[in-house]
Amino acid sequence: MFGDLWWLLILSLLVLSLVTRQGALILLTVLLALGAVLSWLSYRFGLYGVQYTRSLRDRRIFCDQETELAIEVTNAKPLPLAWLLVRDRFPRGLGLVVQDRIHGEDLETFPPELRELIVLRGHESARRTYRVRGYHRGVYTFGTATMASGALFGLQQKRETLEHLDYLTVYPKIVPVESLELSFERPAGTGRAQRRITEDPLRQAGVREYVPGDSVRHIHWKNTAHLGTLQTKLFDPQASEVVMLALDVQTTYDPYQAVPEYLELLISATASLAVDMLEQRQSTGLLVNSGPGDTEHWTHIAPSRHPEQGARLLEALAPLTGFRTLALSHLLYRSMHVLPYGSTVVVLTARTVEPVLLALLTLQRAGHPVVLLTVGDRQPWIPERFTTHHLGGRDAWHQLEGLALA
């Protein structure tokens, strides 16, 4: 409607200028007509030949690490672009570093988005770069983006939505294993001692008296016959054992509630142990009673020492939520048929309920050494037959948050 009135006004001025034969009025009419033509061309062909790309320097980063986000706009036609407004959705939970100040939750728009107003000549490109920091684990989605352009004075606009998405994975917080203070309670009240999680059954280090929970396969029958009491073999730690990390994402007895600090402590401890074990050349796998996006019943990554195993484990841990799809006890029972014989099972949980303890006892009787790592503001009571360590609760997580990466 406005366009018709505009052309009618120009036509009226043209007729008036010809009748009055005033040079200034004729010049004004020509300039207005030329501006109207350019404005119409800008509106009609503004987004034609305009290409928008978004790229991340890294697709996976560690917690507190930075990467670079770049957007590039190319005007592939000879007609200049008077103005182009780009709006690109920026994921909540990431930090946008501008002049060493981190933005993110305080971006002006909701939902947060990047905005750029760009002017381009024909066959010209413009590039903008941003520093992005991942300060919390997760899988973050960039997009969708919207481009708007139009008439010279913005009276008419055309918009185009770009559905292409990009994803950035932020790994869980990884801390030195020493900061977890893994001093384990030895079975049968033998006291606290620093020890590795796994033992090599091929390297015997000594003999001690048998206690309930010890594997029958490790009984030293010759010493048992000599002393008249059951004796168990002790083994040297060795980085060739198979370890399966079993993570319980349910942090309260109500499956529909959660304690975020417990969950982050459990996931950070799992990630830190996995990285440390792989560095020691231990074959390491993962079990979780949840899946990515809560779409799978449970997560299972077979033990491996492959160079890419660490990335597989960290990527599986990054998107986890506190919503479990399977009780931990059921997870342990279901996974028994996929556990390599004699592999050590390290269970990390905030709930040491009776079904879990019974499942651990079943694993022990099946020949799997079991290590239980617990989380909570109060240390739970655990039967002496289990090797256990309490990682702490909310305060422990807040302390780990401030530690440097391992």
Residue ranges and their predicted role:
Residues 25-26, 34-299, 344-348, 362:
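An amphipathic, basic-hydrophobic helix/alpha-beta surface used to engage anionic
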Residues 1-45, 93, 315-406:
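Von Willebrand factor type A / integrin I
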Residues 267, 271-274, 310, 314, ...:
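A general structural signal for well-ordered alpha-helical packing
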Residues 197, 303-311, 389-397:
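Short, structured secondary-structure boundary patches
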Residues 235-237, 276-278, 304-308, 335-339:
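Short, conserved, surface-exposed binding loops centered on an aromatic residue
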Residues 295-326:
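Short, charged loop segments at secondary-structure junctions
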